[in-house]
């Protein structure tokens, strides 16, 4: 996966006869997380960071490569009912990743101040930090117990994750971008069970 991202970066930088147009910006949004595990459910999170666009107008007008570096949360939870004690047990974790997407996209100019765009490509997640806790509920009384201070350092979760994603959206006045995206995790986030991230995101960006 790392070799693929490096190859895309080097490939775009090595085009000698193309007018390369760099644009930098900031982005933030909401993550609606899900997982493929039977007993696991996702939690709503967020993403915030910086992005860059490399326009390639001499290749095809509207073609571009999109890069990002974002702090992104991908929370999960799972529950269990203990019949012997009539207690509901729930584990919750909020892992935070450095999310690095590399997408190839195309912009469709609808008017001077309005464009539609679509992009797709791979991403890499690098686990940074995140706590896990257990909540025990008996009747109307709930007790929270810390389980792990860092799910990655304690090796409860895999630190590296990767997958494929796409984005569609609109660009207003050449600066504001509103987008909806979806990421398919291709790697299990645990060693001993097959649980993969699925993330729907809604984001707003400002590109200079």
PLM regions and their residue ranges:
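Sec/Tat signal peptide C-region and signal peptidase I cleavage site
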Residues: 15-19
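Repeated loop/turn-to-beta-strand initiation elements of outer-membrane beta-barrel proteins
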Residues: 22, 58-63, 174-180
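Membrane-embedded beta-strands of outer-membrane beta-barrel proteins
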Residues: 26, 48-50, 69, 100-104, ...
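Short glycine/proline- and aromatic-enriched beta-strand/turn motifs that initiate or cap beta-hairpins
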Residues: 20-53, 115, 127, 138, ...
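Extracellular/periplasm-exposed beta-strand and loop segments of Gram-negative cell-envelope proteins
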Residues: 35-42, 74-96, 127-161, 165, ...
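Outer-membrane beta-barrel "beta-signal"
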Residues: 196-208
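Outer-membrane beta-barrel strand-turn architecture
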Residues: 54-59, 108-112, 172-174, 208
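Transmembrane beta-strands of outer-membrane beta-barrel pores
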Residues: 30-34, 54, 71-75, 108, ...
